[in-house]
Amino acid sequence: KLWRKNIVGIVILIASDERIEKFRHPVPTEKKVKKSVMVVLGARKYGLIVSLTRIVHFGKLPEDLKRKHFAVCKVDTALISSTKKGKTIGEVFSEGIKTYRITGYPDEWQKHHQGGPTGYMTRYYRATKKINEIIKENYAFAWNPSITGTKSEDTIITNEENQIIITEDKNWPLLRIETEKGEFLRPDILIK
C-alpha cells in the first residue's frame, strides 16, 4: 500500500510476542505471530520522513501490558506536550525522564533512545538532556519512548502555539491522556 501512494518504507521493523520484550528496534524474522505484533515504520515521501509505531494484540490484553502501555503513552504525551517553540530539546527530554519516574518505570529510558528531531533523516540526532538547541516553529520531531514490551511513537511538527501530530490515525484506537496542558490522544494497542 505504501508504494501505491509513493511512500517509501526506509525503516520497517517488526516483532511478535516475546521478541517485542527483547528488541526495541526489532529486525524482522520469520517468527509467526501468536498473540502480539509491533510494527515500527519510518517512511519517506517528497524527501521528508515520518516515524510511527503501532501494536496489535490478539485476544484479551494482559493487565501488565495495559498498564505499561498507558505509562509509555504518558511519557510520550509529556514529550509531545513539552515540544514547544522556545524550549530546549534538553528541557523536553528531561520532562520525559521525569514522567518515566512518575509512572513507576524510572530506568526504562536508559534501555533505548527517546527519539529527537526528524525531517530529511529518521533522526538528525538522539535527544539528551544536555542538548541546548532551542525549538523553533515548524520543527519536526519523532519521540519514541518505550517500556519493556511496548512503545509509543508518532511524528509531530511544532507550530506557533503547540504541536501537530502528523501521523495520527483517527481510525486507530486512541488513549486519552489528560495533562495540565489539555487532553492528548495517543495510539492504544489494537485488540483483534
Named regions from a protein language model:
Residues 1-192:
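Active-site neighborhoods and metal-handling regions in enzymes and metal-associated proteins
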